[in-house]
Amino acid sequence: MEIALVPLENGGAMTVRGGGEAGTGCSQAIGGELQCPPTAGLSDGPKEPAPRARGTQRGVDPGGRPLPPLPQDPQQPRRLPPEDEEGEGDPALGMAEDQVLGAGSLHHQRVLINISGLRFETQLGTLAQFPNTLLGDPAKRLRYFDPLRNEYFFDRNRPSFDGILYYYQSGGRLRRPVNVSLDVFADEIRFYQLGDEAMERFREDEGFIKEEEKPLPRNEFQRQVWLIFEYPESSGSARGIAIVSVLVILISIITFCLETLPEFRDERELLRHPPVPHQPLGPSRGANGSGPLAPPSGPTVAPLLPRTLADPFFIVETTCVIWFTFELLVRFFACPSKAEFSRNIMNIIDVVAIFPYFITLGTELAEQPGGGGGGQNGQQAMSLAILRVIRLVRVFRIFKLSRHSKGLQILGKTLQASMRELGLLIFFLFIGVILFSSAVYFAEADNQETHFSSIPDAFWWAVVTMTTVGYGDMRPVTVGGKIVGSLCAIAGVLTIALPVPVIVSNFNYFYHRETDHEEQAALKEEQGSQSHGTGLDSGGPRKASWSKGSLCKAGVSLENADGARRGSCPLEKCNLKAKSNVDLRRSLYALCLDTSRETDL
């Protein structure tokens, strides 16, 4: 039998693009060679002699007789038969095609993820959208790969993975399944390392209030000073400053209360206004005998400042105010924003708390050089009345403790969040006071022994009754008045009880929010230390395993991978149905015998 061999142009090399015909998009040059643009195929083959038929020579038949020359068409080069292309070809073409097609198909290559026995299937390109996460980073997820089952196994919460996988599929949208609690889903977010940004978006979607970022000064020295005086939990020295501040506040409040005791108050009055030793017993007349002679005020006013400075309460108050002033000035000069510092309500309270001291000291200094005038006693009485009102402002120092007390901060946030409910409560009380005070006045109008002389006079009784205090100083005596009083008490109980659950709910919310924030901060520190330790220990083995897997993947063709995926489905179903150790061993044995299944890393 004679075999006709076709002479090949360009040494038998052909340009293949996507499995199509050779020479697609190419033109023939004068020398008979094909010239192709870069987009026409992958690459030109090497110019090598065409492979000879096995056991034959070029131009002779099997019997050794020369063959007649065949007619050639220089314009239309002949192609090899399909069987020759498949059987005899350049291996470089197949490798190039596998590389390009493998790079394109790797993005769409499917991957199996086993979550506590529940299998999920997705594409590698879907996971690669977030390369910094656990599933998106090949080096991170490699430690969970099971080469026998060709899947990644995670012993985690199964319902939560629906939301985790949707995060990759949707491009970053995180939705918690309805049958998963908040804390469990938050743990899954941290385990799969979705990042702080995903956690913040999750908290916002769930209704959590975003934590305000604490601004810090840019200067390093100012930052350290600001942290020491503003955030007691930042360091040991900051806690020491906070303890000193709390002690000074308590001493100031105790002094403010003790100086009003009768024994201390009388002693202070004697120090400030001692009796005049040369005062005559009987009434003295003036020079013209028209009236009594006014007592000399010079000995009383002149030594006023030394006696005030010698007062122990004044010394303690001065010491406390010096500390408050020092603390306020240091915090003001170290704050990151002077405008924000001036608008802060707590800083305004600090200024108001030390303001009365300087007014009192200025008043004492202003009265020191005064002489004995006729109207000076009246001016002193007026100034003392004003000073009493100003000294009352010192009681606001109690609010300085809220800077160092989480409980007071929670209470303040609760009242701030419940302003609408408190406004409704006051509005309902106002309506009830007007209604029941008018009713009790007209019910008691005909009685001579009534305690309600007018409607405004009955306001006090209505407020005391609606709040269920009941002092008893004002009470109705007639039957109609007692009926009105009973209705007033019942209405007061109902009015006050309505907004109380909302206020309690707000308090619980802020309380648990504060406690959860502290627990999360401690958990972050613990997780950070653990991740640092595991990263140092397992970094080398992970890198070596990933390199080995990459080499194994380079030798797997697209057809074999597709066949492995198709052939793995029955085995996976068998594994899901295995309910005993015997069935499990059989399924593993069948999996090991499956030679068409390739390891996919």
Swiss-Prot record:
A lipid is attached at C335 (S-palmitoyl cysteine). This is Potassium voltage-gated channel subfamily A member 5. Its main location: membrane. SUPFAM superfamilies: POZ domain (SSF54695), Voltage-gated potassium channels (SSF81324). The lineage of its organism: Eukaryota, Metazoa, Chordata, Craniata, Vertebrata. Keywords: Cell membrane, Glycoprotein, Ion channel, Ion transport, Isopeptide bond, Lipoprotein, Membrane, Palmitate, Potassium, Potassium channel, Potassium transport, Transmembrane, Transmembrane helix, Transport, Ubl conjugation, Voltage-gated channel. Belongs to the potassium channel family. A (Shaker) (TC 1.A.1.2) subfamily. Kv1.5/KCNA5 sub-subfamily. Glycans are attached at N288. A motif (Selectivity filter) lies at residues 468-473. Residues 19-93, 275-297, 521-545 are annotated as: Disordered. GO terms for cellular component: cell surface; intercalated disc; membrane raft; plasma membrane; potassium channel complex; voltage-gated potassium channel complex. Residues 259-312, 367-383, 442-455, 476-482 are extracellular. There is a cross-link at K210, K524 (Glycyl lysine isopeptide (Lys-Gly) (interchain with G-Cter in SUMO)). InterPro entries: BTB/POZ_dom, Ion_trans_dom, K_chnl_volt-dep_Kv, K_chnl_volt-dep_Kv1, K_chnl_volt-dep_Kv1.5, SKP1/BTB/POZ_sf, T1-type_BTB, VG_K_chnl. Residues 1-200 are annotated as: Tetramerization domain. Pfam families: BTB_2 (PF02214), Ion_trans (PF00520). Glycosylated. One of its GO terms (molecular function) is alpha-actinin binding. Residues 65-74 have a biased composition (Pro residues). Homotetramer and heterotetramer of potassium channel proteins. Interacts with DLG1, which enhances channel currents. Forms a ternary complex with DLG1 and CAV3. Interacts with KCNAB1. Interacts with UBE2I. Interacts with XIRP2; the interaction is required for normal action potential configuration in the heart. A motif (PDZ-binding) lies at residues 599-601.
